[in-house]
């Protein structure tokens, strides 16, 4: 199924939703680099192709979220540290105190009160 391009005026409204920030990680976005994420996947969950179902996203967040619902995305992010534990480089840098793990709940940029 070929997707229709999202018109520029709609892309601009999506970009402005969170003042030029990724809805998920909160990084600043350039309009030209912003990806439009479907909050509810059109492909799997019959999500709508309209602005209410769009979030501005950076390439990394949009790629990793893929077609996941928000809560599944949050759960997958929460598993990243344990997945990293399997790599030698991660264990070595942790052993030498070069990185530090911080356990905290995953709160997306769009969920923080001052960004709404």
Where in this protein do the model-derived segments appear?
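Glycine-/proline-rich flexible loop or hinge segments
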Residues: 38, 54-57
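Alpha-solenoid HEAT/Armadillo repeat architecture
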Residues: 44, 62-63
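Immediate flanking context of iron-sulfur cluster ligation sites
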Residues: 12-16, 45-53
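Extended charged
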Residues: 1-9, 27-29, 52-55, 63-116
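Short cysteine-rich loop/turn motifs with clustered Cys
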Residues: 6-34, 58
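Histidine-centered catalytic micro-motifs used for acid/base chemistry in nuclease
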Residues: 35-41
């Amino acid at each position: 199924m070929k997707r229709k391009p999202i018109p520029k005026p709609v892309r601009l409204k999506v970009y402005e939703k969170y003042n030029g920030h990724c809805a998920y990680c909160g990084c600043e976005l350039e309009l030209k680099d912003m990806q439009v994420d479907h909050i509810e996947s059109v492909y799997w969950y019959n999500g709508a192709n309209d602005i209410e179902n769009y979030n501005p996203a950076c390439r990394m967040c949009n790629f990793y979220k893929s077609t996941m619902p928000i809560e599944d995305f949050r759960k997958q992010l929460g598993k990243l540290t344990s997945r990293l534990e399997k790599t030698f480089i991660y264990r070595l840098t942790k052993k030498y105190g070069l990185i530090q793990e911080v356990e905290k709940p995953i709160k997306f940029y769009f969920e923080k009160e001052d960004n709404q």
